[in-house]
Amino acid sequence: MTDVPSPFDPKAFVRSLTQRPGVYRMVDGRGEVLYVGKARNLKKRVASYFTRSRKSARIELMLTQVQDIQVTVTHTEAEALILENTLIKELRPRYNVLLRDDKSYPWIYLSSHQDFPRLSFHRGARKGPGRWFGPFPSGHAVRETLNTLQKVFRIRQCQDSFFSNRSRPCLQHQIKRCTAPCVGYISREAYQEDVRHAVLFLEGRSNQVIEELGARMEAASERLEFEAAAQYRDRIQALQAVQERQYIVGEKGDLDVIACVSDGVTACVTVFFFRQGRNLGNKVFYPRIPEGADEAEVLAAFLARYYIGRKAPPELVISHTIPEQKVLGEALSRESGHRVRVTHSVRKERRRWLEMALTNARHALTARTSTQAMALHRLEALQDALQLPALPERIECFDISHTRGEATVAACVVFNQDGPLKSDYRRFNIRGITPGDDYAAMRQALSRRYQRLKKGEGVLPDILLIDGGKGQVAQAEAVLEELQVDDVYLVGIAKGPERRPGEETLILSDEDGREKTLGPDAPALQLLQQVRDEAHRFAIAGHRQQRGKARTRSALEDIPGLGPKRRQALLRHFGGLKAVARAGVEDLARTPGISRALAQKVYDHYHGDSG
């Protein structure tokens, strides 16, 4: 006899609740969490859902599905806010405001464990010794700053393995972007002084650097060292040019300016990053919002989702007054290790920055709405062209990339009704096939992808698009049949005889195996081309990455008995791999730590076993 669950009685449940702070989870009959919320008083907050007061349409709809409520009691409201954010990120409930893009922001990293520190791009957890500068709104902003640092201060950015094996300066020294510390062209003291100036620049103290360089320029001129004086002059001019381009005239300090606009269906949040008065740029988000959510509600949810779990600056300037603004500040202060002030009422410079953020958010939302309208038009055209019973909600496209069979990579890109869904993109490193066999590569990639989906790990597409002709489509048909994947419409897109855009042929997987051509200006074809081209781009990027890894791997790593220290000794002794490959046994054996037997192994590896 099976147990029949008791019907949920909200009144009885509310009577059992505590008045302490905590987090509540609304759960449906299947055990799926519909909504996560936090409360200063759990009893009052949960009870408010079941009063006769008027509620938004989305809350009314959600309550018709609630079969259980789970609660977690916390010590403080700030602690509840942090837990709420953690659960929303983990469970992604459908009635909460969710961030689509939660990728970590990039930073500039300055190592501190070497005599000649290195500057580099970093994204991810910040661990290990050294200093971190940022965050920056994009990888482009980091690379632009690194490029400026390299031009002005000539700090090395090469990998440690490259640095430790140089016998002569590299190209960066020749183009005056590095002082070649690898071969002793600059003293440790002089290099550290350049590093100190670079740090001052990253901290927003360029004026101090300019003053110091100006004093050195004058001193060099007095000593009649005109070449050195000219170098200082060039650095000063480069820094002044950067100041003109990046600095905001007015207040200093670290803060983010966050603005939210919504049309009731789509919301846009833009975040501007200011560090030491310098505008580092902005990032735009389009959070998924429940129907009827207002701008203040969206902004409050965004701030919690985005900032809890990452270090916030001391000040957040926001476009709307939000509920429990003080509690959010307390939670962020705890997370960040310093006081975080969340404010809406600002004047002067900050008011201008906030207006700028709002203007950008409005423009971005308008552009997004226009793009969505075009995407919907193309989807409707595709539905009509393929005679589909419903509008396709998800399209997946596969492509293969390799160089004469080397480093074969298959790529899968995903589009939904909003465009590319990059969080669902996947790459597959293809192994165990005959090099260059595209059919086998496609078969392997599709099998790996849809075996997972059959296990419930993901969502099946409405349309599976294959970049290829009848042969590739046949491979896809075989895989889908073998895995018993139904209700997926298979389409191949084959290039025309001249491989010109607009001349593609569609290979359809219906009973007749029809071929179909659309006009070059047909919206349906333009959509398929966009998806196909994105798969092509994603596949090529993955292939180049794999090929680069394989080709930069030292051939010495394949020689038994030749560990990292001995490999390094060989490279130092000969100055590079090419010289090692050309060396004879006797020359190899003269390297410190290399026996004659090991030298013979190295020689045989490059020249073949003569025995």
From Swiss-Prot:
UniProt-listed GO biological process terms: nucleotide-excision repair; SOS response
UVR domain sequence ranges: 207-242
Location, primary (coarse class): cytoplasm
A Pfam cross-reference name: HHH_5
Coiled coil: none
Alphabetic keyword roster: Cytoplasm, DNA damage, DNA excision, DNA repair, Excision nuclease, SOS response
GO molecular function: DNA binding; excinuclease ABC activity
Entry's family note: Belongs to the UvrC family.
Protein name from the UniProt record: UvrABC system protein C
Name of the gene this protein is made from: uvrC
